[in-house]
Amino acid sequence: MLTTICLDADDTLWHNERLFQFTQERFAKLLSGYVASDHLIDRLRDAERRNIERYGYGIKGFTLSMIETALQVTENRVPGSVIAELIACGQEMLRDPIELLNGAEETVRTLAADFTLLLITKGDLLDQERKLAQSGLGKFFDGVEIVSEKTSEVYVDIFGGRGIDPRHALMAGNSLKSDVIPVIAAGGWGVHVPCSPSWDLEATDAPMQHNRFREITALSDLPGVIKDICGNM
C-alpha cells in the first residue's frame, strides 16, 4: 500500500515555465539588433545548460545566463542599459506572484488527509520558499525538501532519512527527467503530470513499459490513480 505521496512544485502545483518563456521573449527583443531570435534562444539555452552546475536551477542562474549570452553575441559590445534591463527582468521574475494550477489546492488537501505528504522541489532556496509561502499550500505538507538536483540518489537519501520504504512511495510531477524516472530507479512509483509550456532541458522519453509508471492529464486525476495503485498492490 502507498503511504507517502511526494509532489513537485513548479509547473505541478503552480505555473512557472511560462514566466521564463515570457522573459525569453523580452530578452530576444532587447537583443534583436544583434542576432536572429531563434539563434539567440539557442545560445541562451546552451548557456543555461552550462551554468546549471555553477548556479543551479532558478531565476538567478537564468538571469546570469541571459547576461552572459548578451555579452557573447555582441562580442562584449552590449550597452550597459541592456544589461540593466536584463537585471530588471530577473528582479521582476522574483517578484512575480504565483498562480496555482487548476485543482492543485483541492488535490493537495485531499491527499494530505490520507497520506504522508512531501513537497520535493529543486531550485533556489529563497525563491522556492517564497513561492511555497505565497501558495498557501505549505500547511498541508508533512515535510519540504528543496534540493539542488533530483537524481535517484537524492530520492534514496530523502526516503532513507525519513524512514520511508520507497516501494510505498509515489512521486508526481511535470518532469519525466526529475520527478518520474529517478524515483522509479530509487524503487518508488512515478506519475507524470504534463504541463505546457515545458522546459526543453527537462525533455526525455517516458518509461512507458515500466509497471511503476503512470501518466495523467491533470493533477486532479492523481487521487484516482493512487486509489487504483493501492487496490492492486
Can you name each region flagged by the protein language model?
Residues G80-E99, A104-S135, E145-E149:
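Substrate-recognition element of Asp-dependent hydrolases with the DxDx(T/V) motif
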Residues M1-R43:
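Active-site neighborhood of HAD-like aspartate-dependent phosphohydrolases
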Residues T23-A28, L44, E48, L86-Q91, ...:
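Hydrophobic alpha-helical core bundles mediating ligand binding, dimerization, or RNAP-core interactions
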Residues F20-A28, T63, I67, L125:
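An amphipathic alpha-helix signature
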Residues S32-A47, E75-L86, F140-G143:
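Short, surface-exposed acidic
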Residues A47-E92:
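A metal-dependent, Asp-based hydrolase signature
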Residues M1-L2, E105, R109, D124-M233:
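Asp-based, Mg2+/Mn2+-dependent phosphohydrolase catalytic module
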